[in-house]
Amino acid sequence: MTSKLSPNRSSSNLREDSVSTLPNQTLIAPELLAPAGSLRNMRYAFAYGADAVYAGQPRYSLRVRNNEFSLESLAIGIEEAHALGKKFYVVSNIAPHNSKLGTYLKDISPVIAMKPDALIMSDPGLIMMVRDAFPEMPIHLSVQANAVNYATVKFWQKQGIERVILSRELSLEEIETIREHVPDMELEVFVHGALCMAYSGRCLLSGYMNKRDPNQGTCTNACRWSYDVKAGEENETGDIVLTSEINKAVTAPQVVIPTLGEGTPSPKVFMLEEKEKPGELMPAFEDEHGTYIMNSKDLRAVQHVGRLTQMGVHSLKIEGRTKSHYYCARTAQVYRKAIDDAVAGKPFDSTLMGSLETLAHRGYTEGFLRRHAHHAYQNYEYGHSVSDKQQFVGEVIDRCEESGYAIINVKNKFCVGDSLELMTPSGNITFTLNEMLDKRNHSITDAKGSGHQVRIPIPSDVSLNFALLLRNLDEGVDTRNPFRKAPSAVTPENASEA
């Protein structure tokens, strides 16, 4: 999809949360690009508004441990995407060692024969090999190539690259400068998902600690683990060692200045011990916040969709090939509305920020799009994803012909009396659950948890294709119950797009 703004536009004085177009200027929607770790994720992403998805073969992409795609499923995914008028990109962005070069063309040839819309690549050697063997194959430059300036983008344009996925470490102003200097190159920008504290994911922590190389797709997310902290000191040779009981009282503390110039200097040196690996110690420094040493918050840039659209960015990308189909559906739904509103010239809908709060996350940040103090990037509270707004509790698999009730595959426990949200591609309904039946149509009060199946009443005129069920955790959630009215009474009051 090509997305450009008509000439002579400047957005330097426009707010990030609004869209304003001048006469004779037409905004074209950027592509909404969603992650696909599985065929199911792909299908939900498309149902909720994604224009394209990206997926990879495990051996050659950076998602080896959580990737359900094989040659057979890639073929199915590409065929289904094209049947819907959507696009499917195949990721091939590892930093390959010599051992993988000999088999690469043999392994990628059947994938290219499936006619994906592009390969996402980062290594110049692999790019050269594909260019020589398959000169007509479109190539997008992966974020792993660290394109952070317009000269780099121009270089790759001369190599025949059709699109550059810009590094996450860029500000809005830097992205706009690149757009102005290379107006005829397609640009792609990450707008949502996990961030890495290393430069665009080029990290060795997992490889150092677990012999799992992140640059070969086997990252174990060691940066997000929980660590015990023990007192340390610098010895006479400059090594960091455990502080002994004998010299603890006389050892001078090591004052550590925060690298970003914010916060209180730390008076201590520590040794970190991962709880699952007792006895293996790693030196580190700590300030007043805690010991999550490289645990980034998650990127959320929905409030900047308007400005990125004005710049003429071609594709807005969501990270998350290891996430659930619910994650793919919710993020696609929210960013679809943000893009459509931007193109229509509507102001930013701040409720979209709240919709993304319902996803499990590690805290949100704007990343580098705007500059912040260091605590705005780092998560000091937890190493896993959580949400205190909503919980994904089930997926709708069918409608019972006899009762008209929705048949739910339960993922997490919920009960009669709970505030629920039915999420569908056409809109969302919030209600209080008044009744629940088991598979034998016996009345029950709670769905026990994953592996169970229950039936609940749903208005008959609501399409249940790709519908998901969420439990609201906020006590203040407004629960207008559609079941107190006739089944057809799904009104703007109780059905709204997220």
What are these regions (language model features)?
Residues R63-E80:
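Glycine-rich, positively charged N-terminal anion/phosphate-binding segment
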Residues G125-L126:
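Alpha-helix capping/helix-boundary segments
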Residues N149-A151:
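Conserved nucleotide-cofactor-binding alpha/beta core module
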Residues F134:
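Conserved phosphotransfer cores of two-component systems
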Residues T2-R9, N13-A47, A52-R59, I78, ...:
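Surface-exposed amphipathic alpha-helical tracts and adjacent flexible/coil segments at the periphery
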